[in-house]
Amino acid sequence: MIARLRDRLADRNRLPRPINAAIDWVAAHPMSIPGRLAALRYGRPQSGTPVTAFAPADRRVLIAPVNYSGQGRAWAAALEATNPSISARNMAVEVPGGFAFAADLIVPVAVYQNDRDWQRRQFEAVATSATHVLVEAQEPPFGRLWGRRTDTQVAALVARGVDVAFMAHGTDVRLPSRHIARSRWSHYADPSVYVPRLEQLARHNRALLDRAGRPVFVSTPDLLADVGEAQWCPVVVDPQRWANPSQVGARAAGPLRVAHAPSVAS
């Protein structure tokens, strides 16, 4: 019965409108009483989680907090490989049941959401050590610190002299209504996709970027349709991971084979 209820809740389009509205409201107000109660589902944090540390360097860059498709770590490695005067680190929240990618600092979701001590220590470590921070997907790098407001956390870093920019990844800023209008193949048109919350999230994040007034990067060029002022930062692909020695020198039969593992499965 519990499994059936979980499946029913997972298919948001099958829920009554008032229930969907209530779920969306809690998601949009994480520091409300229902939002605080919802955060308890992440569990009790264990103490002693480390914070970000950099190697000695002229410029010290943190990329956080989602590491979608391992790109946060890949970008950090690319920065260090390009310029020896840069120490780059990434931090990612570990979500049970989600995709697992290597990161310099992996923080359990219970710590990220509910450990005020870690949130404060991480902020202080970054504010005193980093020269640059790249905030991924407009998610708050320090969990629920200061009301879980990304703009407040960014402003606090800027006030401490840290240069902050944003990295938009996809659903965080891609407006479903616009995407459906311009592409008949839009995945947002799939009946299994719950569009209202995604539309709300994209509009919220677009407004956040406007308020913050910081530089913005996008990981795929199609996002320039939603964030026209952004700069494209290409994703990093390690060809060695995809190499197939058995096919070297052999003529491939049939069409090109491509593996696709989305960061968020619908």
Model-derived features: where do they sit?
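Membrane-proximal helix-turn-helix segments that form the acceptor-binding/catalytic region
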Residues: 154-156, 184-215
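N-terminal pre-catalytic "stem/leader" segment of glycosyltransferase-like enzymes
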Residues: 14-140, 159, 172-179
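Helix-loop-beta element that forms the nucleotide-linked donor phosphate-binding surface
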Residues: 206-240
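Well-ordered, non-membrane alpha-helical segments in soluble/globular domains
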Residues: 113-120, 145-155, 197-206
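Short, flexible helix-coil linker/hinge segments at the edges of structured domains or between repeats
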Residues: 178-197, 228-253
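Conserved donor-binding/catalytic core segment of Leloir-type glycosyltransferases
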Residues: 61, 244-266
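Short, flexible/disordered intra-domain loops and linkers
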Residues: 106-111, 140-150, 180-185, 191-192
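A structural signal for short, well-ordered beta-strand segments and their strand-loop junctions
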Residues: 87-92, 133-135, 162-168, 216-220, ...
